[in-house]
């Protein structure tokens, strides 16, 4: 049996290693481009001639631009230097069609200085929507005082169905890049990702590619979007420019395609935005480290869930285990899952929380020795009996909870009242979930104390699932890294560091109360070594 479990774990680890190596090879293929070896099919860079260029940005309500009619010039950068970084904010006139839930497009031209883009055969251009459709985020108000009178009147006029309808939002940022590497491409093996951004011309006997213009869509974040009202005649637009290398350009193209694919597979704008934030707000080298950390996090998540389920599946007795701690973990994980769901947290955080909540519900059934009997549509619950040793454990458990209740209940009630008076929420449900989860996060470590107290009274930690604890500890330290990378509520960040402290206390107890290898444990295993127990003073 042991061999079967070991083989399965080895298989999972082996698949994980192959996946990591394959991903590294794919990433290398993305950022590395083979240069031309010198034969006649080389494609030279037009920028190597240092032409005088001009950058022009126009806006229009049409997705296809045939002429210069019905366009507004919003930015004109004469004597444009591709090596110089800049950022400028301009006011854009919003047409009536756009204010009525229409779309507005930005046309970005890179052309020769002093020549209109429509008259320049060597111009390059890209189009990008300046608006997007999204359901507006519910406004937060004080639940006791209510919102401002104007907000309440506007909300009453708005039909209920309109609250869930997507409306036009303004993208206040337009990020531009030009690839500045004087790279000579091999015409026989052009990268497909870059080729769709390339425009080539014939100059004499050589083929040259015009400057590669790129619009960074990953920089458009949901948190920056502005709802377009019918009174919005002008809106600000920040146009920023920076040069980009070929390797980074190819990586960015692939990331944009990946985000687009997520949206095509049904990911919401919010979930796709969380993925964008990882790439935009993080250094690329740190991002590579994050990938490996995330991969190991998924592996340890799987191994922790597997060993935890295996431990509880075999467990027939609750000797040495705090039932109150099991009930608390179940309550806290369910509340945390509902809280993360209400906060629209990213899927990498939400999915493991949901799986953990389901496992904790199953563990409560095991801890209470509960049997569910279905009689038609109505379930009947039967509870098993406890042995003398289990009842003694329950006494220690109840004693620890009695002391904790004197501190816990006043703090939780006081915190809920304070947040109701001073913090704005979307709804009463949001306040209730936030109050529960703040109690879970802020005082959750107190509910871990009953198990520590039971360990102290029994002078043993042999009854704990140490394999699952070890994998969870690895993930706790990984969560400390993710707390600064992935978007999550502040209270969830603090909880990551709280778990570090608790695990260190468990390690201290494991050192203080070594496993008695001379006795048979609950799995029927025994060892020959005689333990050297360290002295302990009550």
UniProtKB/Swiss-Prot annotation:
Residues 32-284, 342-402, 450-538 are extracellular. GO terms for cellular component: endomembrane system; endoplasmic reticulum membrane; membrane. It catalyses: a 6-(alpha-D-glucosaminyl)-1-(1,2-diacyl-sn-glycero-3-phospho)-1D-myo-inositol(in) = a 6-(alpha-D-glucosaminyl)-1-(1,2-diacyl-sn-glycero-3-phospho)-1D-myo-inositol(out); 6-(alpha-D-glucosaminyl)-(1-octadecanoyl,2-(9Z)-octadecenoyl-sn-glycero-3-phospho)-1D-myo-inositol(in) = 6-(alpha-D-glucosaminyl)-(1-octadecanoyl,2-(9Z)-octadecenoyl-sn-glycero-3-phospho)-1D-myo-inositol(out); a 1,2-diacyl-sn-glycero-3-phospho-(1D-myo-inositol)(in) = a 1,2-diacyl-sn-glycero-3-phospho-(1D-myo-inositol)(out); a 1,2-diacyl-sn-glycero-3-phosphocholine(in) = a 1,2-diacyl-sn-glycero-3-phosphocholine(out). The keyword Hydrolase does not apply. It is found in: Endoplasmic reticulum membrane. GO terms for molecular function: phospholipid scramblase activity. It is a multi-pass membrane protein. The chain crosses the membrane at residues 11-31, 285-305, 325-341, 403-423, 429-449. InterPro entries: CLPTM1. It comes from the Eukaryota. Residues 1-10, 306-324, 424-428 are cytoplasmic. Keywords: Apoptosis, Endoplasmic reticulum, Glycoprotein, Lipid transport, Membrane, Transmembrane, Transmembrane helix, Transport. The keyword Ribosomal protein does not apply. Scramblase that mediates the translocation of glucosaminylphosphatidylinositol (alpha-D-GlcN-(1-6)-(1,2-diacyl-sn-glycero-3-phospho)-1D-myo-inositol, GlcN-PI) across the endoplasmic reticulum (ER) membrane, from the cytosolic leaflet to the luminal leaflet of the ER membrane, where it participates in the biosynthesis of glycosylphosphatidylinositol (GPI). GPI is a lipid glycoconjugate involved in post-translational modification of proteins. Belongs to the CLPTM1 family. This is Lipid scramblase CLPTM1L. The lineage of its organism: Eukaryota, Metazoa, Chordata, Craniata, Vertebrata. The gene is CLPTM1L.
């Amino acid at each position: 049996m042991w061999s079967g479990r070991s083989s399965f774990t080895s298989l999972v680890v082996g698949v994980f290693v192959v996946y990591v190596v394959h991903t590294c090879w794919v990433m290398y293929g993305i950022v590395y481009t083979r240069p031309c070896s010198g034969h006649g099919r080389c494609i030279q860079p037009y920028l190597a001639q240092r032409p005088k260029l001009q950058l022009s940005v126009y806006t229009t309500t049409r997705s296809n631009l045939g002429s210069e009619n019905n366009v507004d010039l919003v930015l004109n950068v004469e004597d444009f230097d591709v090596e110089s970084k800049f950022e400028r904010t301009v006011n854009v006139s919003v047409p009536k069609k756009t204010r009525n839930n229409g779309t507005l497009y930005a046309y970005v031209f890179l052309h020769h200085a002093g020549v209109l883009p429509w008259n320049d055969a060597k111009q390059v251009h890209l189009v990008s929507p300046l608006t997007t459709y999204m359901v507006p985020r519910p406004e937060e108000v004080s639940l006791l005082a209510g919102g401002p009178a104007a907000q309440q009147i506007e909300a009453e006029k708005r039909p209920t169905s309109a609250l869930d309808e997507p409306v036009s939002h303004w993208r206040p940022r337009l990020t531009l890049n030009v690839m500045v590497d004087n790279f000579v491409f091999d015409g026989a093996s052009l990268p497909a990702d870059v080729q769709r951004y390339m425009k080539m011309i014939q100059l004499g006997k050589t083929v040259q590619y015009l400057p590669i213009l790129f619009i960074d869509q990953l920089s458009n974040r949901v948190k920056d979007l502005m709802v377009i009202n019918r009174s919005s005649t002008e809106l600000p637009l920040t146009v920023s420019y920076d040069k980009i290398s070929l390797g980074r350009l190819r990586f960015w193209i692939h990331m944009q395609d990946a985000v687009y694919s997520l949206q095509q597979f049904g990911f919401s704008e919010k979930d796709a935005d969380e993925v964008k934030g990882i790439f935009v707000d993080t250094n690329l080298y740190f991002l590579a480290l994050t990938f490996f950390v995330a991969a190991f996090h998924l592996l340890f998540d799987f191994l922790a869930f597997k060993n935890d389920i295996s431990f509880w599946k075999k467990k027939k007795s609750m000797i040495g285990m705090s039932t109150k701690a099991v009930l608390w973990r179940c309550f806290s994980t369910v509340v945390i899952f509902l809280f993360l769901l209400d906060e629209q947290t990213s899927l990498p955080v939400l999915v493991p929380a949901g799986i953990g909540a389901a496992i904790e519900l199953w563990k409560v059934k095991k801890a209470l020795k509960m049997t569910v009997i279905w009689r038609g549509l109505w379930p009947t619950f039967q509870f098993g009996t406890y042995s003398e040793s289990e009842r003694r454990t329950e006494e220690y458990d109840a004693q620890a909870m009695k002391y904790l209740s004197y501190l816990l209940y006043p703090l939780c009630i006081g915190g809920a009242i304070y947040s109701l008076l001073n913090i704005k929420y979307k709804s009463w449900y949001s306040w209730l979930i936030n109050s529960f989860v703040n109690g879970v996060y802020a005082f959750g470590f107190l509910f871990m104390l009953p198990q520590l107290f039971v360990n102290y009274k029994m002078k043993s930690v042999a009854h704990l699932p140490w394999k699952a604890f070890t994998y969870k500890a690895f993930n706790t330290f990984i969560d400390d890294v993710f707390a600064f990378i992935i978007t999550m509520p502040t209270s969830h960040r603090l909880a990551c560091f709280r778990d570090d402290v608790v695990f260190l206390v468990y390690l201290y107890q494991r050192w203080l109360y070594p496993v008695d290898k001379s006795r048979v444990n609950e799995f029927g295993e025994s060892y020959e070594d005689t333990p050297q127990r360290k002295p302990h003073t009550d």
